[in-house]
From Swiss-Prot:
Chief subcellular location: cytoplasm
Positions annotated as active site in the UniProt record: D303 (proton acceptor)
Residues annotated to bind phosphoenolpyruvate: K20, R119, Q163, R334, R375, K400
Highest taxon of the lineage: Bacteria
Location in or out of the cell: Cytoplasm
InterPro entries: Enolpyruvate_Tfrase_dom, Enolpyruvate_Tfrase_sf, EPSP_synthase, EPSP_synthase_CS, RNA3'P_cycl/enolpyr_Trfase_a/b
Protein's name in the database: 3-phosphoshikimate 1-carboxyvinyltransferase
Family: Belongs to the EPSP synthase family.
Subunit structure: Monomer.
A single cellular component GO annotation: cytoplasm
Pathway: Metabolic intermediate biosynthesis; chorismate biosynthesis; chorismate from D-erythrose 4-phosphate and phosphoenolpyruvate: step 6/7
Species of provenance: Dehalococcoides mccartyi (strain CBDB1)
Residues that, per the record, bind 3-phosphoshikimate: K20, S21, R25, S161, S162, Q163, S189, D303, Q326, K330
Amino acid sequence: MKIHLDKSLPGGNIAVPSSKSYTIRGLIAAAQANGQSHIISPLIADDTLATRQVLSELGIDISTDAGSESWEITGNTFKAPSGNLFCRESAATLRFMSAVCARLPFECHLLAGHSLMRRPMLPLIQALHQLGIEIETRGNTTVINGQVITRSKVSLPGNISSQYVSALMLMAPACTHGLEIHLATPPASLPYLKMTKQTLGSFGIKVHSSIDWQEISIPPQPYLPARYRVEGDWSSASSFLALGAIAAPVFISNLDTDSFQADRIMIKFLAEMGAEIESGQNWVKVNPKPLSGINADLTHSIDLLPALAVAAACAKGQSILSGVRQARIKESNRIRAVSQGLSAMGINIIEEDDRLIIEGGQPKGAEIDSFGDHRIAMAFGILGSVVGETHISDAECVTKTYPDFWKNLESLGGKVTQDV
């Protein structure tokens, strides 16, 4: 699907969807608890539905509560699957479920979608090998011969993806002796490990971590059933926060300003650039002001790259976005996708190994390739609405995390049409 955006000045009120990261973590924790758990206000999108489907095919009963926005999970009823477990394009599903399947006493075949195949799994595979697990990749399939895990020490790099570490944390309580996880390098995206710890705590799991988070210890212990409420998604909000800074005031509800989510820092970056930020209990409002360039380290909030780059393109002066190397191994090579998109819109941009240098200016409409990446589509959807005459390819990719994105943009006054 291709989206065409005419020039407009979108602004107004929206509520962002629930957090993908918390929904997936909550689902996997609930699936390992004895008894019934409730996930309240889950995100319903491709990535979370992938996790739900994989768990269902492993014998976990998950139903939607009638008349309420919640899922009911009857946990710890795992059984051998009858076929492949399709993870769609969800890296969190593939990585987290690889670890969970490793401790189940049967063979599992986890099938990756097309773009997911290019995202690295080796550090997690090597970590599971250390624990005695037989796991290998065959084309787009990860084959795991699960077993009772009696080894308790594992080491892996922390600077490639926090998801490898979160995967081990989610499986650790069910290991015979728990797990002691050593990170050989400081962790990237540290807030995501804190989110995992918070979720585990909601299901009764005690986690011990060193100050620098390079040592994590989780004793063997049972998951307890819980009522687990999912907060709003700061990552999904980031493009609309940028919109408020470059176009017209945007009021966003369903955002916890005290959240552990890494991408909450977006409002700090926008404030440093000159935008006016207001916030209260469960809401944020961004008012446009003349923006200046920024030096921003995205090491722990890499998903902000597209949205912050769009704001930087409209700012006066130079912006340097650093700590972005790992953006190359997301749903697309986001450094290349952002660079190509902004260049097409007339913005001078220098692409380096771990930095993007953006000279702010006056972007103009262009043909934008989203590369099937939801965050690229959303960020350029915002910018395209402001400058007009913009076409975005593969725009349906937003269903990965934000199915109503284009509808929400229209509700704010964006002129969005689907090209036939």
